[in-house]
């Protein structure tokens, strides 16, 4: 579960390495896979598309807490990760690194198509 002040990895090539969750959309206290959060960039790569300290939207694609699937199996990722998106819900990067759990919302189909592995 992702809360405010959670440090997250960025799973795309937008130029950000680490972001800090500063808000959750929908009036919730915690976010899970597929939820949209407001983040601030903490560390960036040179010549990236994002700037340090700027505020962006992101969708959660991996969480460390175990997730139970409908068939009874449990998925647990090694890190919390997000993909940065613009206001229209399209990813800022052109690649998504690492596995991604299937996002239930139809608005993030582009992220699932860019991912290397969808669980």
From Swiss-Prot:
PROSITE patterns: RIBOSOMAL_L14
One GO term (biological process): translation
One GO cellular component, as annotated: cytosolic large ribosomal subunit
Keyword field contains Ubl conjugation: no
Annotated keywords: Ribonucleoprotein, Ribosomal protein, RNA-binding, rRNA-binding
Entry superkingdom: Bacteria
Gene3D superfamilies attached to this UniProt entry: Ribosomal protein L14
InterPro entries per record: Ribosomal_uL14, Ribosomal_uL14_bac-type, Ribosomal_uL14_CS, Ribosomal_uL14_sf
A GO molecular-function annotation: structural constituent of ribosome
Family statement: Belongs to the universal ribosomal protein uL14 family.
NCBIfam families, alphabetized: rplN_bact
Subunit structure and binding partners: Part of the 50S ribosomal subunit. Forms a cluster with proteins L3 and L19. In the 70S ribosome, L14 and L19 interact and together make contacts with the 16S rRNA in bridges B5 and B8.
Function of the molecule: Binds to 23S rRNA. Forms part of two intersubunit bridges in the 70S ribosome.
Protein name: Large ribosomal subunit protein uL14
Record lineage: Bacteria, Pseudomonadati, Pseudomonadota, Alphaproteobacteria, Rickettsiales
